[in-house]
Each structure stands twice: as structure tokens, then as C-alpha cells.
Amino acid sequence: MHKYQTHWVEHSIVKILSSTGKKHIALMVGGMSAEREVSLVSSEGVSKALIELGYRVTFIDMGADIAVRLQEIKPDIVFNCLHGTYGEDGCLPGLLNIMRIPYTHSGMLSSALAFDKIHSRIWFLTNNINMAESIVVNKSDNIKNDPMKRPYVIKPLTQGSSIGVEVIFAEDDFNFADYDFPYGDQVIIEQYIKGRELQVAVLNGKALGALEIKLLKNRFYDYETKYTEGFADHLCPAPLPANLYEKLLIESEKIYKTMNCKGPARAEFILEEQTNKLYALEINTHPGMTPLSIVPEIAAYAGINFTNLIEEIIKMASFES
């Protein structure tokens, strides 16, 4: 079994963190996805901020009985701190729409579209957003040779935090015939663009700023690099010419709007070294809130501290009727 996998959990774990407050917030964390640990780390700072803001807070580590538990708890708002399957992919927003409980972050369709790399790519290209060349490969295709000229990137369709992402360079001892499709029967094979990794934080439709990621150890921005201190430097704001920086913000707001996102999001790009051409990678509708996460860092640069960021996210809580 691979290290990061979705697993089924029958019962939710519920803890009261604060029993008094102006509104009752259910902080939804953990869950059953491969990104469970990231969600738990994100929830630590979020829970402290919610209590500091004067909310009544109930911590819920989500299991399959979540609908019953929500009926028992009766929160005013759900703060969706889940990452990955069941939380970020539209499942939880869909349930909360049915239950008519306001929730933070993007809605069901926006979350589902952004989480699925095939459908988000179709949506991006339909709206004239530039992306690298890619193809879909099915396990049943039984491809024995490289499906694309090296270097290329292998991406699972529905994983976040770069889980399962592999970059295959010309010199690598890699045989595609041996690839075991650990995260589903389809993958995206994407042209590798050599360039600068840029990330933009968007909050309630407004781009707050951009930063550049400088890799210090690994060859690409993988799970280990994202969540291990000392594996990457964040240059905030991104050291770009003013016109290019502004273009990056405008493009991010365009993606956010066309995907009908809500609350916080993080748009990811590669700036090709030779041509200065921007390539969109994805938009993350449930960005991390860990000490190493990008959205809180950019928000701080824009003058919004972590507690105020959480308050702004809460203000946009709603359900889709």
C-alpha cells in the first residue's frame, strides 16, 4: 500500500473546544483522504483563531456518520478545513447544501471541478487560460513506452498536495510499463515546463499577492517540499517586473471567477524561463492553513494577519440553494 491513501472511517470524532461564543462553528478536519495529516495541522491554527474571535467551536474529525453528527451538533456554520477526498472534492459542500448549513470555501461544483484535473483543464482551456500540453492515460491502455517526450509529469486525477506526482526526466531510470497507477486507473501526463513556480492567493475574488517558490533540495515542488521546513524558500512578493506581476494577479482573479470560487483559493503557475510565458497549473479551492502554507503568508504580506484571515473566510460562509 502506498503511503498516502484514502481510507474509510465509520465514526466521526467530536470534541468541544469552546462552549460559549457568538456563533457555533463546526471545524471539519482530518477525514478519510490521503491529505488527512495536512488538514489536522491546518486545523490547529484555525481553531485557535476561531476561539480568539469569540466563536463557540466544535472540532469534528469527519467519519462516514457525519450527517447524523451534524444533526446532533446543529452548528451555525461549518468551517471546511478538510483537504482532498470528501472535503475538497465537493462531497461535503453537497451534503451541507442539502442540510442547509452555511459553510466556508467553495461550493460543490466549483470544488469538484477544481479537484478533478481533467475537468478543470477543460474548464481552463474553454476560458482561454494557457496550460501545458497534456494527455490522459488509462491503465487499460497498457502503454509500454513513454506516453510523451521527456521530460513529462505524471499526475493522479484527484489528489492534492502533489501526492502521487512524479516528474520523469531524460536521465531517469524509469519504465512506464512498470507504473502501477497507485491513485486510480487514469492519470494526466503533462509536458514539463522548466521555469519559475509562482503562487497567488485569492480571497473573496481579490488577488492578495503572489510569491515565488525556490526549491532547495528536491527536483520539484512535491509533498515533502511543501510541508518540510528548509526544503524551499518563499520569495514574497514574487520578484517580477510590475507588468508581469499584475498580469499574474489578473489571471488568478479570472480563474477564480470562471470557476465560481468562494472564500480563499490559491492559483498556481509556471513562468517559462525562456519566453516569460505563463502556464496555469491549477486552482486550489481549499488551500492549506499550516505554518508553511502560502495563502496565510501572502495574506500577511497584504496586511491581513491569520486571525483576520479566518474572520474574512467566515464572513463568506453560505450554502447553495
UniProtKB/Swiss-Prot annotation:
It catalyses: 2 D-alanine + ATP = D-alanyl-D-alanine + ADP + phosphate + H(+). It is found in: Cytoplasm. Mg(2+) 1 binds at residues 268, 282. ATP binds at residues 147-199. GO terms for biological process: cell wall organization; peptidoglycan biosynthetic process; regulation of cell shape. It is an enzyme of class 6 (ligase). It holds the Pfam family Dala_Dala_lig_N. Keywords: ATP-binding, Cell shape, Cell wall biogenesis/degradation, Cytoplasm, Ligase, Magnesium, Manganese, Metal-binding, Nucleotide-binding, Peptidoglycan synthesis. Mg(2+) 2 binds at residues 282, 284. One of its GO terms (molecular function) is D-alanine-D-alanine ligase activity. Residues 121-315 form the ATP-grasp domain. Its cofactor is Mg(2+); Mn(2+). SUPFAM superfamilies: Glutathione synthetase ATP-binding domain-like (SSF56059), PreATP-grasp domain (SSF52440). InterPro entries: ATP-grasp (IPR011761), ATP_grasp_subdomain_1 (IPR013815), D-Ala_lig_Van_CS (IPR000291), D_ala_D_ala (IPR005905), Dala_Dala_lig_C (IPR011095), Dala_Dala_lig_N (IPR011127), PreATP-grasp_dom_sf (IPR016185). Pathway: Cell wall biogenesis; peptidoglycan biosynthesis. Its EC number is 6.3.2.4. PROSITE patterns: ATP_GRASP, DALA_DALA_LIGASE_1, DALA_DALA_LIGASE_2. GO terms for cellular component: cytoplasm. Binds 2 magnesium or manganese ions per subunit. Belongs to the D-alanine--D-alanine ligase family. Cell wall formation. HAMAP family: Dala_Dala_lig. This is D-alanine--D-alanine ligase. It comes from Rickettsia africae (strain ESF-5). The lineage of its organism: Bacteria, Pseudomonadati, Pseudomonadota, Alphaproteobacteria, Rickettsiales. The gene is ddl.
